[in-house]
Amino acid sequence: MPAKGREFYIPHRAVIRENAETTKMRIVYDASARANDTAPSLNECLDAGLLLQNQLWKVLVCARFYAVAIAGDIHKAFLQVRIREEDRDTLRFHWINTEYPEQVRALRFTHALFGLAPSPFLLGGAIQHHLSICRPDYPETVLEIEGGMYVDDLLSGGQTVGKAREIKGTAREIFGKASFQLHKWNSNARELEVTDTVDDESGVTYAKEQLGAKPGECALLGLRWNKDADTIAVTFPQEVAALTKRGILGKVAKVYNPLGQAALLTLVGKLIYRDACQQKKAWDADLSKELVKCWEMW
């Protein structure tokens, strides 16, 4: 397919996860890759747009006010947003012809893709526009959705199972009008998780795998949600850090703690890193025996 103007080929690679129950291989497209040190990446050439999503901590806190919480997400959300035909040549990629492996085909995306700088803005703008159209017919639910959306995730609920079921049903109806499918429903009221789509079958997703989620738990915007006890928890990475300044900084930085629940614990790790910096050691130099002892106790 000959290009008619601007043109960019996005590199991609396969990510293999042998332990996954469903998708063992994912294709990752890297729009931040550069051809060389002086060439800009595709993302550097694009305007990321306005920040339209809600604040993460606000969505999480508001969801905790409901006695009955529900959480779902939009199925393949970015791929539901179509790109103008005149812009699609910037989303080209190479693909090996399965029938003739010696041939390489040039394909292009017709919809927004994950990892593209403007994709969150394009998705957020599409959702906001659609909700504005639906507002006259569903004023209460639209307001609820607007406060509970974070990119493609919806957190909502009610003080009773009946109210939460009503919100869930109306939200599915609203998004369905724009061909968005809400799926992967989770709730602390298990009867609300029953679905009529094969797409919602439970399994060890990548998010669950990363969080080390157990049966009855799921990922809630990156936190581990125990639906039976209705508690959320912070996950600490299990891998052993190198006993260097770089190693302990990497370990502390991997603790995802958006609500500050584990602040008292992470503070100790940060203080150890501060002490390592004050000793003016190189990034990969071994820590002193005193700091190693403190780190191992932490």
Where are these regions (language model features)?
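Conserved acidic
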Residues: 1-298
